[in-house]
């Protein structure tokens, strides 16, 4: 069963890769068509485009690193190639996490209702808040790249001094653990911010939903259904985001203890987030949902 596990998970990875490219590509395409026709895009549409592009990059990086790890090819990559591969992975992962976090803050400020003066101040300046957070996240990216570059330089110096297979393998595992630990630590900040934002948004939606149900008791108020669906989507978003962060954390621990099966399983589950969450974004966005249903109807009609 253990020998069959890599083959099974590889098939799952490829399926997630295809789904992720289709869903994120769909978001980019529909918003691009809308931008060409209207000559303008809303703030949320711009966020969705950049998020979808970063996720496409992340999905490709995960697929490449999967096959490199599967066949132990990463240790044969040159210093420049290794830097390009790891830096691309870090950049795509950074923007995927931070843009999802920024999207959660955007939804919180746009949808939630709180009487706090601080919240109202941020709500009135939502575009500036989003821009400042995005620019601030670049500081984390810069520090992350510096730290990772130090790990790469240290490993290359040791690798050039001893090229035996056993040394290369054991030292590369140590290097990989250091890289994964650094990524986990830098992922903690956007995850914490997103967790707080989603929790506040869920609390606000739940509170508002209860009020609406009391006011329209015995009636099927359309707005109640809209808020219920929004609540379900937000909770699903939170669960997927949390599972992705936990996969990063557990994959680091499993690599530390050299548990290959758990590591591979976490990588597979981790790819489910950037692949599947885009479908939630499509279903939660009226324009994207309408376009998706139209495409689905045309495809179904041709069968």
UniProtKB/Swiss-Prot annotation:
Keyword check for Coiled coil: no
Superkingdom of the source species: Eukaryota
UniProt GO cellular component terms: plasma membrane
Glycosylation sites: 162, 166
Extracellular side, ranges: 1-7, 77-85, 150-184, 254-261
Ranges in the topological domain labelled Cytoplasmic: 29-55, 107-128, 206-232, 283-303
Compartment(s) where it occurs, according to its Swiss-Prot or TrEMBL record: Membrane
Coiled-coil segments: none
Bilayer topology term: Multi-pass membrane protein
Residue spans crossing the bilayer: 8-28, 56-76, 86-106, 129-149, 185-205, 233-253, 262-282
Single GO term (MF): G protein-coupled receptor activity
Keywords: G-protein coupled receptor, Glycoprotein, Membrane, Receptor, Sensory transduction, Taste, Transducer, Transmembrane, Transmembrane helix
Function: Receptor that may play a role in the perception of bitterness and is gustducin-linked. May play a role in sensing the chemical composition of the gastrointestinal content. The activity of this receptor may stimulate alpha gustducin, mediate PLC-beta-2 activation and lead to the gating of TRPM5.
Misc note: Most taste cells may be activated by a limited number of bitter compounds; individual taste cells can discriminate among bitter stimuli.
Family under the similarity heading: Belongs to the G-protein coupled receptor T2R family.
Protein name: Taste receptor type 2 member 13
Gene that encodes the chain: TAS2R13
């Amino acid at each position: 069963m253990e020998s069959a596990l890599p083959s099974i998970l590889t098939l799952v990875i490829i399926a997630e890769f295809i789904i992720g490219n289709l869903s994120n590509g769909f978001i980019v395409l529909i918003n691009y068509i809308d931008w060409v026709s209207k000559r303008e895009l809303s703030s949320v549409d711009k966020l969705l485009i950049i998020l979808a592009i970063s996720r496409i990059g992340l999905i490709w990086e995960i697929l490449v690193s999967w096959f490199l790890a599967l066949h132990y090819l990463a240790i044969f990559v040159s210093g420049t190639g290794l830097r390009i591969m790891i830096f691309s992975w870090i950049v795509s992962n950074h923007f995927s996490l931070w843009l999802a976090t920024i999207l959660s803050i955007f939804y919180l400020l746009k949808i939630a209702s709180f009487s706090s003066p601080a919240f109202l101040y941020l709500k009135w300046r939502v575009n500036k808040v989003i821009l400042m957070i995005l620019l601030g996240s670049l500081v984390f990216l810069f520090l992350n790249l510096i730290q990772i570059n130090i790990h790469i330089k240290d490993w290359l110096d040791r690798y050039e001094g001893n090229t035996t297979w056993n040394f290369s393998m054991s030292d590369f595992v140590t290097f990989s653990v250091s890289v994964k630990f650094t990524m986990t630590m830098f992922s903690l900040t956007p995850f914490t911010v997103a967790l707080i934002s989603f929790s506040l948004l869920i609390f606000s939606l739940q509170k508002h939903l209860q009020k609406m149900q009391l006011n329209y008791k015995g009636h099927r108020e359309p707005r109640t259904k809209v808020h219920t669906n929004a609540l379900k989507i937000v909770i699903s978003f939170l669960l997927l985001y949390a599972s992705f962060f936990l996969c990063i954390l557990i994959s680091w621990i499993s690599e530390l203890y050299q548990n290959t099966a758990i590591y591979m399983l976490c990588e597979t589950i981790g790819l489910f987030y950037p692949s599947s969450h885009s479908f939630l974004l499509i279903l939660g966005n009226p324009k994207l949902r309408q376009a998706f249903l139209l495409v689905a109807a045309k495809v179904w009609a041709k069968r």
